[in-house]
Amino acid sequence: HRDLHSFPTRRSSDLGSEETCIGSAEELTAGIEKSIEAGFMTENPYEGFVAGDNSKENYNKIDLHKPYIDKVVLVSPSGKPMYREPDLIDVWFDSGAMPYAQHHYPFENSEKYNPATGKGVFPADFIAEGVDQTRGWFFTLHAIATMIDESVAFKNIISNGLVLDKNGNKMSKRLGNAVDPFSSIEKYGSDPLRWYMITNAQPWDNLKFDIEGVEEVKRKFFGTLYNTYNFFALYANVDEFRYSEAEIPVAQRPELDRWILSLLNSLIREVGDSYESYEPTRAGRAISEFVTENLSNWFVRLSRKRYWGGEYSTDKISAYQTLFTCLLNVAKLMAPIAPFYADLLYTDLNRVAGSEPDQSVHLADFPVFDETLIDKDLEEKMDIAQKVSSMILALRRKEKQKVRQPLAKIMVPVLNPHFREQFEAVKNIILAEVNVKEVEYLTDAAGIIKKKIKPNFKTLGPKYGKLMKEIAGAINQFGQAEIAAFETSGSYTITAGNEPVTLAAEDVEIQTEDIPGWIVATEGQITVALDINVTEELKLEGIAREFINKIQNLRKDNNFEVTDRIVLTIQKHEKTDEAVIRHKDYICAQTLANGLELTDKLNSPNAREAEIDKDVVTLILVERQL
């Protein structure tokens, strides 16, 4: 109640020739006794109050607020009556005294105040309010702290931005663009709503709120994390994984495991630094990318076969331990932003392993990164694998070529020996991911892959002004050798205005031209060419992979367990029979089939149609092996 607090200054009755400021209840009660002796007061309204007794019971005996405090008349050094100053100071000064008033400082808790070292409760670590508090609370906190301690009152400050509608307009009932937060929480949950708001804009920036963004966050981040945990739980239950085995040393784990654990520890460091520097947006975005792009879309997808069937090998245990560690740490990292889902994930994981001593993620210690597990070279190699795979898959989409259709070859120009070494280390991962048989390295691609170069006027103009046209003309004259040299070094020096000018990669745009039978893509310094010719042998293997996909879907439709063995019957078709016969063992192995029979006519009511290729439809019967 700021308006009820009195201004503690007292002035003498002769227009304030004498004044004093009362600094404590003890000083006030002592002044009252003198006033009674001088005849200005007849009784002590704070009778029974014991100076120095800081108990709540003692302070309940007195009331220092208006109007009671106005009945107190004190005595000046010269014997004049002194009355409370009736004027008001800015009421925000009352709020500015909060750091001291909340702990009854300096009369109690002095050990909590050490501005010189910054330890204790003062100065505060963090404060957040609207920008209007620049002249209000923010100012009075600093003003009082400066007067008392010659110190700042807080170390970090955020002025919250506004929540606007998706078009950047202020929300209002009149315009009909206001979003009801309670119905949004009811529909999507508080964690997805909070995650969207934190990751979509920095807290100090205005947020253009779009409910479709909340839907996307719930689907893409929380949905992906939920599916990743479900995948883990499904196979962990099958194999009765409880993390009871001895921990496999990270150095002895497969490269894929070491990579994701390296990324995890890099993530722990980045998220910890982000929270420490009050940048939750950076933390949330890093966690989202790790979960969706690296953990789910890369590690789990490339590791799936390690969890399927087979013996409980060291490789399978490593896969379980690695995924468990990632999920557990993600729960801890996301807890400040998504407290409810993080706690659910944490407790579910702890039921599996029981390795965590705390009942809640909010009681657990924040993760600490292990520098020895961070392998930047391995991260770079896997980044190449991800980029190249993404480029090739994009080329497949461009050609409307299904990933299940194997292709023969990719060609990759080699810029330097180190790049070739890194590419070779992840070659098999790339080939498996994009379903291509082999890679050919080109040490001199100039005669095979043709490139074009164009000046980037957006960067050249601000950098070089009047020289831009001359520089652009020189760039347009580059041949294949100059382009190759530019790509290799990342820069190129020309002469313009009779002066040497060094161009950076951002100053040009390099494009690749397709060659007959191939399609080509370039991203940064990486170029790939994909052979799009499909031989008869590749066609047959593609058909076999289509059968595998359709059979797996039928297993799911029939609610088979992942460990159930099956028997397959396929109706003959002139365009698919050879593929089934040639790749029978492969189809059976991939679908857990103990047998596969081709039949002229499949009459079972449980048989299902399957479109294997355009205008190629046959029947498949999937039965559980009894």
What is the predicted role of each segment?
Residues V121-D132:
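A short glycine/serine-rich beta->alpha loop
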Residues P115-V121:
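Short, surface-exposed loop/turn microsegments at beta-strand edges and helix-strand junctions
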Residues H1-H5:
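Short, exposed "boundary/linker" segments that immediately precede the start
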Residues P106, S110:
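Aromatic-residue-lined binding/catalytic grooves and analogous aromatic/hydrophobic interfacial grooves
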Residues S6, R10-P99, Y105, I148-E186, ...:
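Feature 926 captures the class I aminoacyl-tRNA synthetase adenylation module centered on the KMSKS loop
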Residues T140-M147:
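Short Ser/Thr-interspersed hydrophobic loop/turn segments at strand-loop and sheet-helix junctions
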Residues T199:
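Structured mid-domain segments that build the active-site/substrate or prosthetic-cofactor binding neighborhood
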